[in-house]
């Protein structure tokens, strides 16, 4: 291989490595977002269950008064 080809190869390898590092950082950000969304989803599910229990309790009171 000529020196020029080796230089081009080195440039392409360096660019690829930089791209891989950027993708790793993006992946880490997406993992963090996913974790945050999972936590938010769990909180919303708990809120929904709480409200559902309250509504069912009120419906039960209404039914017992009828």
From Swiss-Prot:
GO terms for cellular component: cytoplasm. It is found in: Cytoplasm. It comes from the Bacteria. InterPro entries: Cell_div_ZapB. Residues 3-59 form a coiled coil. One of its GO terms (biological process) is division septum assembly. Keywords: Cell cycle, Cell division, Coiled coil, Cytoplasm, Septation. Disulfide bonds: none annotated. Signal peptide: none annotated. Homodimer. The ends of the coiled-coil dimer bind to each other, forming polymers. Interacts with FtsZ. Belongs to the ZapB family. Non-essential, abundant cell division factor that is required for proper Z-ring formation. It is recruited early to the divisome by direct interaction with FtsZ, stimulating Z-ring assembly and thereby promoting cell division earlier in the cell cycle. Its recruitment to the Z-ring requires functional FtsA or ZipA. This is Cell division protein ZapB. The gene is zapB.
